[in-house]
């Protein structure tokens, strides 16, 4: 992916799909009114993206409207404990923490450099006491975290955001459900993938598409949750996420 910058937000341009300029024009217009530079969290969020780029991280964070949507979801649910699988530079976790002053977030990141940058960004934003970054493979760390939930060392989560390798997406989702409280929400990012989710060539040859389909199909059979996939046309081009609510 390549990226360009506008006055209000970071624009993600996909090489796999032709964007309509109205998509990001609408985001720029709405963000200028609903998330203007005068907001208290604007400077720290901008600094997070800036430092992440400066330190060489990929420009693949959740786009600003999606990150704020998740922060508002946590507000709606009165969430006190959240889980994130895939920290990158900490942008989403910082956004959520900035709008939820009582929330505590556990975030898992496999890449040591990304985790280091995320910790820098989190400290710069002043949330180091509320966002914990665990470094390692989620498939290894989630069972340890689940054990802590079951023995009472860790509170159950009211919100989970999964934005990591898609081939293990279902496994991450399964662990998230096991660690969630009733009526918790779980979001799995990047499942639509510019429509590749239903394109035969990608179904056969793309491990990310196969992983996303496995997640969607298994969630559909899972009596513990109810779920929907929402397609998005926005700054990050054409994609979508799965959102589930734990019964």
Swiss-Prot record:
Q: Does the keyword Lyase apply?
A: no
Q: Which UniProt keywords apply?
A: Metal-binding, Methyltransferase, S-adenosyl-L-methionine, Transferase
Binding positions (S-adenosyl-L-methionine): 84, 86-87, 138
Record note on cofactor: Binds 1 divalent metal cation per subunit.
EC number(s) on file: 2.1.1.-
What function does the entry list?
O-methyltransferase; part of the gene cluster that mediates the biosynthesis of imizoquins A to D, tripeptide-derived alkaloids that serve a protective role against oxidative stress that are essential for normal germination. ImqB is a canonical three-module NRPS that assembles the tripeptide backbone of the imizoquins via condensation of Trp, Tyr, and Leu-derived precursors. N-methylation by imqF and phenol oxidation by imqC, followed by cyclization via the FAD-dependent oxidase imqH carry out the three-step transformation of L-tyrosine into tetrahydroisoquinoline.
Residues binding a divalent metal cation, per UniProt: 163, 189-190
For biological process, the GO terms are: methylation
Q: What induces it?
A: Expression is down-regulated by ralstonins, lipopeptides produced by the plant pathogenic bacteria Ralstonia solanacearum. Expression is positively regulated by the imizoquins cluster-specific transcription regulator imqK.
Supply the enzyme class, top level: transferase
Q: Transmembrane residues, as ranges?
A: none
What family is this protein classified in? Answer: Belongs to the class I-like SAM-binding methyltransferase superfamily. Cation-dependent O-methyltransferase family. CCoAMT subfamily.
Q: How does it assemble?
A: Homodimer.
Q: Extract the GO molecular function terms from the UniProt entry.
A: metal ion binding; O-methyltransferase activity; S-adenosylmethionine-dependent methyltransferase activity
**The protein's annotated pathway:** Secondary metabolite biosynthesis
Q: Which InterPro entries does the protein's record reference?
A: Cation-dep_OMT, SAM-dependent_MTases_sf, SAM_O-MeTrfase
**Domain of life of the native organism:** Eukaryota
Name of one Pfam family that matches: Methyltransf_3
- Which cofactor does the UniProt annotation name? a divalent metal cation
Binding locations of substrate: 163
Lineage, opening ranks: Eukaryota, Fungi, Dikarya, Ascomycota, Pezizomycotina
Q: What is the name of this protein?
A: O-methyltransferase imqG
């Amino acid at each position: 992916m390549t990226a360009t910058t506008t006055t209000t937000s970071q624009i993600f341009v996909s090489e796999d799909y032709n964007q309509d300029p109205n998509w990001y024009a609408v985001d720029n217009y709405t963000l200028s009114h609903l998330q203007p530079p005068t907001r208290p969290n604007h400077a720290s969020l901008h600094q997070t993206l800036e430092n992440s780029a400066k330190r060489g991280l990929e420009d693949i964070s959740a786009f600003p409207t999606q990150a704020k949507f998740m922060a508002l979801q946590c507000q709606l649910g009165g969430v006190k404990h959240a889980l994130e699988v895939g920290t990158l530079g900490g942008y989403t976790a910082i956004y959520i923490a900035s709008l939820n002053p009582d929330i505590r977030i556990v975030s898992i990141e496999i890449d040591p450099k990304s985790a280091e940058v995320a910790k820098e960004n989190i400290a710069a934003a002043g949330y180091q006491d509320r966002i914990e970054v665990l470094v390692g493979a989620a498939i290894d760390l989630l069972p340890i975290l689940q054990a802590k939930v079951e023995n009472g060392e860790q509170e159950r989560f009211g919100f989970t955001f999964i934005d990591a390798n898609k081939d293990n997406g279902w496994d991450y989702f399964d662990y998230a459900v096991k660690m969630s409280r009733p009526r918790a929400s779980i979001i799995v990012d990047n499942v639509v993938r510019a429509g590749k989710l239903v394109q035969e060539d990608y179904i056969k040859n793309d491990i990310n598409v196969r992983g996303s389909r496995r997640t969607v199909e298994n969630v559909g059979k899972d009596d513990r949750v109810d779920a929907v996939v929402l397609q998005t046309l926005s700054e990050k081009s054409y994609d979508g996420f799965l959102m589930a609510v734990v019964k």
